[in-house]
Amino acid sequence: MTAVPNGSRSFITVLTLTVAFLAASASPARADITAFLGVSPTPQNHAVKGFGVGLGLLIIGFEFEYAHLSEDSLEQLPGLKTFSGNVLVQTPIEVAGTQLYATAGAEGYRETLGAAQETHVGTNIGGGAKIKLLGPVRVRLDYRIFKLQGSPMHSVYQRFYVGANLKF
């Protein structure tokens, strides 16, 4: 049997203990799902609804979201559907039952009003809070600003929503 030099044995021991410590202290990934209702003031108040699915690590999270801003042809308010992927930077722990976050992402969108439509891409930024209610159930408050590329009727949309969030 070949002997392992003393310096190598120390390195292997330190490496093994480091990997064991990191594995034992690693925070598990957390997922959540949100169903929401909200309002957009662009160009004037009208309803929005949608859902999101997210995965959070300690501070960084990822989210995929679908939202539908209803069209009102009588009031000449365009409809907007977005499919977005976002990165969240969030507080690692809840403070007084509240987890705060900031988000940025990119989306594909379709804006419609009657026969007119525009399909293109855009970006969004925003932030919000997830507030613990009972067990894994939380209320989510979210504000976003969407910047649409191409030739939309409105190049910037704002949105505020309140959602039911389930953490698992």
Predicted regions: what is each one?
Residues 40, 67, 146:
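Active-site beta-loop-alpha junctions enriched in small/polar residues
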Residues 39-49, 72-79, 113-118, 149-157:
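Solvent-exposed loop/turn segments connecting transmembrane beta-strands
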Residues 54-124, 131-135, 139, 160-168:
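Gram-negative (and chloroplast) outer-membrane scaffold detector with strong preference
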Residues 34-36, 109-111, 147:
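Extracytoplasmic loops and strand-loop junctions of Gram-negative outer membrane beta-barrel proteins
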Residues 1-32:
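Cleavable N-terminal export/targeting peptides
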Residues 30-39, 100-104:
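Transmembrane beta-strand segments of Gram-negative outer membrane beta-barrel proteins
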